[in-house]
Every structure is written in C-alpha cells, then in structure tokens.
Amino acid sequence: MKYVVIFKAKIKTLDEQYFQTAQLLREKALSQFNCQKFEAISEQDFEIALSYWNSLADIQAWHHDAEHQVAQQLGKEQWYQSFSVEICKIERHYAHSVHSI
C-alpha cells in the first residue's frame, strides 16, 4: 500500500440508503478498483474512513466512477454537513500484534 485516502465528515443524517450505498461502494472499491483495505469509524456526529491504495491512478478512477459520483452528490445534499478528503503517501508502516498460544 502506497497511499491512504482519509475521508473526514461531520454527519448531518444517515438513513438506510446511506448504509446500503456505503456497503455497496465499499465492496465495489475493493473488488473492482484495486482498493487494498478499507476502515471506518463513527463517533457521535463525526465519521472518518481510511482507504488504502497502490496508485494514484486507482484513486482517480474510483473518484470518477459513476456510482461513486452519485454517492458523493448525495453526501453533499443529504448525509454530511461538511467533509474533507486528504490523499497521503505512506512512507513507512509499523505494526504489532499479540497472538494467543
């Protein structure tokens, strides 16, 4: 993974359409657009999502996908008060895991 896209949003209202769309698009990004991993968390009225990618070309292709564009518009009109997107290059990665025997 070379890049991470950081999506941060202040939530207005999330309805059933949001949850269905989010699940569909997550699966589509992972299966059709070379997204390597996706993580998201919400707390009160704040949401943050991290998606990991190998290339800027894959990120751009995903951004321009027709279904993703519709969801972006719905986000602006219905689901979010505000949001921001940051695309960052991953220079290093560290991890630790404790395994039970």
What are these model-derived regions, one by one?
Residues M1-E47, L56-H64, Q81-I101:
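Short S/T/G/P-rich N-terminal loop/turn motif that feeds into the first structured element of a domain
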Residues A71-Q73:
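Low-complexity, intrinsically disordered Gly/Pro/Thr-rich segments
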Residues G75-Y80:
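Arginine/glycine-rich "motif VI" loop of SF2 helicases in the C-terminal RecA-like domain
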